[in-house]
């Protein structure tokens, strides 16, 4: 009765249903694991052969027997072996799909070994493709080398929409997500990665990529990106491509085992001795049924207890981790005691907020340089009493921004509440903001090309953290040169989150009736319609990239330049194939032309008018860090007619506020890092 009262009848029924489905799934997967592997294809070119009584034949049988033995590396899903001596040496490997158990792996390898000499009876080299594994051997030493022969391409029977725009958008999404998975796989020890991305509320993209783990990082990445590129022209909603060295697949349904992704379990203990080559043992078919039943019962009981305990704890805590309301933020402030600073300490550090210590001023207050008694230098933002940043926003800033820890974000060190005083303390940036160096003729020489390239990459890393890698998904909405601060080593740190918004778990865009930001950096869809998303941040990043390369403000152009802004100027140079004319003359003779042109290309991709055409920041970061990623052709940048904005007289960087519809207060502002 306690359980019924705790869950309710409907909840209890749901729980029983869940357990039933779990057991059904478990039994189904157990049964499936004992089935024969699903054969896809094989390739055994008839270029060279061997006789049945030759030394090569003996070496091959030795190698295959090793793969089918109980001592094979089923737990890692990969093994390579060389048997014999030159010229009769045989090199071989097996590779199991990274989401499968050691039992399924051993079953597939043993099965493929048993079939190999039937499918390719006398060929010296062969590769066998199964749903669960790949088996390969050759008289050549192919280890740690990418092989682009023996290709297998399979396609989903369903085509993508015949509408050109929808088709291109789908392909772009698939390619960017699969390339991200390829990058993750190449940088992992197992050379394996999966992706799961919601395309719409009804469609989810699943992807899987894998290399043989003996490949170097760059070789794996090159193989996978080539594999992915081979699938894109098929224009299908799903496809897979195999080479002996790597393979990739995407579908709109879950084709891999999501629950098994992770560190492989230890290899099972198989009874008996090494099986003969002609009849390798297939583990899993002789299991003890009594043990299986006991295991299922115990598993079900443990699952039930775990669910009851979880629900009981959930009833006790009733705590959500989504965007906090003002009252919740107020409660959480109690947990931020470690960040709360004594007002008098800050007052002393800034010499009572002396005018000589003032280093910046913006719409939300003034910024002072301070020095604590231990010698630590800090930046102190003192919010003005008539600031638009209210009590709830201030609390949200302390609670949320304190959790954003990244080397390319300015760090919040503490806060203080004293009467009407609202003070925020940040790490001090001795080189101030990017615009102070980039657009100052006397200081521009401090930024050579390598430093500018490092700044571009650092900004991308910071945005990637906000959009994808942090616990919260945060849209900055005001990325510009004055909001990129530089530390003592000219490393960039994103600042000023006063206009930022938190997105929910499944949220991809939002709208606002009060458009705030800086013209020239605003994406067209935001400036004209109040629509913002991760892609609007990408647009602002693209403008920053072009400013960093050219050393010119987006707003510094006039009619004498023959262009209204930096984007128009860049686009004309690009279409005239004179992109290098954009480069700041101060660095033109000390930079790699190919690297600069690639950055210009990336910048133009980011500022395309259609948000769907812009790459995600993760794709941008991959483009910046790997020259093997193919860049698509950029479309024309976003252009829009600027209405007469209402300038904020307190903002020295000409941030603007445009009222597109009856205005409301800036809802859900997160924080405001100096300077403004």
From Swiss-Prot:
<feature type="modified residue" description="Phosphothreonine">
    <location>
        <position position="518"/>
    </location>
</feature>
<feature type="binding site">
    <location>
        <begin position="359"/>
        <end position="367"/>
    </location>
    <ligand>
        <name>ATP</name>
    </ligand>
</feature>
<keyword id="KW-0418">Kinase</keyword>
<dbReference type="GO" id="GO:0106310">
    <property type="term" value="F:protein serine kinase activity"/>
</dbReference>
<feature type="active site" description="Proton acceptor">
    <location>
        <position position="478"/>
    </location>
</feature>
<feature type="glycosylation site" description="N-linked (GlcNAc...) asparagine">
    <location>
        <position position="187"/>
    </location>
</feature>
<feature type="compositionally biased region" description="Low complexity">
    <location>
        <begin position="652"/>
        <end position="662"/>
    </location>
</feature>
<keyword id="KW-0677">Repeat</keyword>
<feature type="region of interest" description="Disordered">
    <location>
        <begin position="640"/>
        <end position="666"/>
    </location>
</feature>
<feature type="topological domain" description="Cytoplasmic">
    <location>
        <begin position="313"/>
        <end position="676"/>
    </location>
</feature>
<feature type="domain" description="Gnk2-homologous 2">
    <location>
        <begin position="151"/>
        <end position="255"/>
    </location>
</feature>
<dbReference type="GO" id="GO:0009626">
    <property type="term" value="P:plant-type hypersensitive response"/>
</dbReference>
<keyword id="KW-1133">Transmembrane helix</keyword>
<feature type="binding site">
    <location>
        <position position="381"/>
    </location>
    <ligand>
        <name>ATP</name>
    </ligand>
</feature>
<feature type="modified residue" description="Phosphotyrosine">
    <location>
        <position position="526"/>
    </location>
</feature>
<feature type="modified residue" description="Phosphotyrosine">
    <location>
        <position position="426"/>
    </location>
</feature>
<protein>
    <recommendedName>
        <fullName>Cysteine-rich receptor-like protein kinase 8</fullName>
        <ecNumber>2.7.11.-</ecNumber>
    </recommendedName>
</protein>
<feature type="topological domain" description="Extracellular">
    <location>
        <begin position="35"/>
        <end position="291"/>
    </location>
</feature>
<keyword id="KW-0675">Receptor</keyword>
<dbReference type="InterPro" id="IPR011009">
    <property type="entry name" value="Kinase-like_dom_sf"/>
</dbReference>
<dbReference type="Pfam" id="PF00069">
    <property type="entry name" value="Pkinase"/>
</dbReference>
<feature type="glycosylation site" description="N-linked (GlcNAc...) asparagine">
    <location>
        <position position="46"/>
    </location>
</feature>
<dbReference type="InterPro" id="IPR054603">
    <property type="entry name" value="CR_prot_dom_plant"/>
</dbReference>
<keyword id="KW-0067">ATP-binding</keyword>
<feature type="signal peptide">
    <location>
        <begin position="1"/>
        <end position="34"/>
    </location>
</feature>
<feature type="glycosylation site" description="N-linked (GlcNAc...) asparagine">
    <location>
        <position position="288"/>
    </location>
</feature>
<feature type="glycosylation site" description="N-linked (GlcNAc...) asparagine">
    <location>
        <position position="257"/>
    </location>
</feature>
<dbReference type="InterPro" id="IPR002902">
    <property type="entry name" value="GNK2"/>
</dbReference>
<dbReference type="InterPro" id="IPR038408">
    <property type="entry name" value="GNK2_sf"/>
</dbReference>
<dbReference type="GO" id="GO:0005524">
    <property type="term" value="F:ATP binding"/>
</dbReference>
<feature type="transmembrane region" description="Helical">
    <location>
        <begin position="292"/>
        <end position="312"/>
    </location>
</feature>
<feature type="glycosylation site" description="N-linked (GlcNAc...) asparagine">
    <location>
        <position position="53"/>
    </location>
</feature>
<keyword id="KW-0723">Serine/threonine-protein kinase</keyword>
<comment type="similarity">
    <text>Belongs to the protein kinase superfamily. Ser/Thr protein kinase family. CRK subfamily.</text>
</comment>
<dbReference type="InterPro" id="IPR017441">
    <property type="entry name" value="Protein_kinase_ATP_BS"/>
</dbReference>
<dbReference type="InterPro" id="IPR000719">
    <property type="entry name" value="Prot_kinase_dom"/>
</dbReference>
<feature type="glycosylation site" description="N-linked (GlcNAc...) asparagine">
    <location>
        <position position="71"/>
    </location>
</feature>
<keyword id="KW-0547">Nucleotide-binding</keyword>
<keyword id="KW-0325">Glycoprotein</keyword>
<dbReference type="GO" id="GO:0007165">
    <property type="term" value="P:signal transduction"/>
</dbReference>
<keyword id="KW-0808">Transferase</keyword>
<feature type="glycosylation site" description="N-linked (GlcNAc...) asparagine">
    <location>
        <position position="114"/>
    </location>
</feature>
């Amino acid at each position: 009765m306690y359980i019924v009262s705790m869950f309710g009848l409907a909840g209890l029924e749901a729980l029983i249903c869940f357990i039933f489905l779990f057991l059904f799934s478990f039994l189904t997967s157990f049964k499936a694991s004992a089935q024969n592997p699903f054969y896809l294809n094989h390739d055994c070119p008839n270029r060279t052969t061997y006789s049945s009584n030759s030394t090569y034949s003996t070496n091959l049988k030795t190698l295959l027997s090793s793969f089918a033995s109980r001592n094979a590396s089923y737990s890692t899903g990969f093994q390579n072996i060389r048997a014999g001596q030159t010229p009769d040496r045989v090199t071989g490997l097996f590779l199991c799909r990274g989401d499968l158990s050691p039992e399924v792996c051993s079953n597939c390898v043993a099965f493929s070994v048993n079939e190999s000499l039937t499918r390719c009876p006398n060929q010296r080299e062969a590769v066998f493709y199964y749903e669960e594994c790949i088996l390969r051997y050759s008289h050549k030493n192919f280890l740690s080398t990418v092989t682009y022969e023996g290709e297998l391409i399979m396609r989903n029977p369903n085509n993508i929409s015949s509408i050109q725009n929808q088709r291109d958008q789908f392909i772009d999404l698939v390619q960017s997500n699969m390339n991200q998975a390829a990058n993750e796989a190449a940088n992992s020890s197992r050379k394996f990665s999966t992706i799961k991305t919601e395309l719409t509320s009804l469609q989810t993209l699943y992807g899987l990529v894998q290399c043989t783990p003996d490949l170097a990082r760059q070789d794996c990445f090159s193989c996978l990106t080539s594999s992915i590129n081979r699938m894109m022209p098929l224009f299908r909603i799903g496809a897979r491509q195999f080479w002996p060295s790597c393979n990739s697949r995407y579908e709109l349904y879950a084709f891999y085992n999501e629950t098994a992704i992770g560190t492989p379990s230890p290899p099972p203990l198989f009874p008996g001795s090494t099986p003969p080559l002609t009849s390798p043992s297939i583990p899993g078919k002789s299991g003890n049924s009594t043990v299986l039943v006991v295991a299922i019962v115990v598993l079900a009981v443990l699952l039930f207890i775990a669910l009851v305990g979880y629900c009981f704890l959930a009833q006790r805590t009733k705590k959500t981790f989504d965007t906090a309301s003002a009252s919740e933020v107020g409660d959480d402030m109690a947990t931020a005691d470690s960040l709360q600073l004594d007002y008098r300490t800050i007052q002393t550090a800034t010499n009572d907020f002396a005018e000589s210590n003032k280093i910046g001023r913006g719409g939300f207050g003034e910024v002072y340089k301070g020095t604590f008694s231990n010698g630590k230098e800090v930046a102190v933002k003192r919010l003005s009493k008539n600031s638009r940043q209210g009590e709830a926003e201030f609390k949200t800033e302390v609670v949320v921004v304190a959790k954003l820890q990244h080397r390319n974000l300015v760090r919040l060190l503490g806060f203080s509440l004293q009467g009407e005083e609202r003070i925020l303390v940040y790490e001090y940036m001795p080189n101030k903001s990017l615009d102070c160096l980039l657009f100052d003729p006397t200081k521009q020489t401090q930024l050579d090309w390598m430093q500018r390239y490092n700044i571009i990459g650092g900004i991308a890393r910071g945005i990637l953290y906000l959009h994808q890698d942090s616990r919260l998904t945060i849209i900055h909405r005001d990325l510009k040169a004055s909001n990129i601060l530089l530390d003592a080593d000219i490393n960039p740190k994103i600042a000023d989150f006063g206009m930022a918004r938190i997105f929910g778990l499944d949220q991809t865009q939002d709208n606002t009736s009060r458009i705030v930001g800086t013209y020239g950096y605003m994406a067209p869809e935001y400036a004209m319609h109040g629509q913002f998303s991760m892609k609007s941040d990408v647009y602002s990043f693209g403008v920053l990239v072009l400013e960093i390369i050219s050393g010119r403000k987006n707003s510094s152009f006039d009619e004498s330049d023959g262009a209204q802004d930096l984007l128009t100027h860049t686009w004309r140079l690009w279409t005239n194939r004179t992109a290098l004319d954009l480069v700041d003359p101060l660095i033109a003779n000390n930079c790699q032309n190919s690297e600069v042109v690639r950055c210009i290309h990336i910048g133009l991709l980011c500022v395309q008018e259609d948000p769907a055409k812009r790459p995600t920041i993760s794709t941008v970061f991959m483009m910046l860090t790997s020259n093997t990623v193919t860049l698509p052709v950029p479309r024309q940048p976003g252009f829009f007619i600027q209405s007469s904005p209402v300038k904020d007289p307190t903002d020295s960087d000409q941030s603007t506020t445009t009222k597109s519809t009856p205005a409301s207060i800036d809802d859900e502002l997160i924080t405001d890092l100096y300077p403004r």
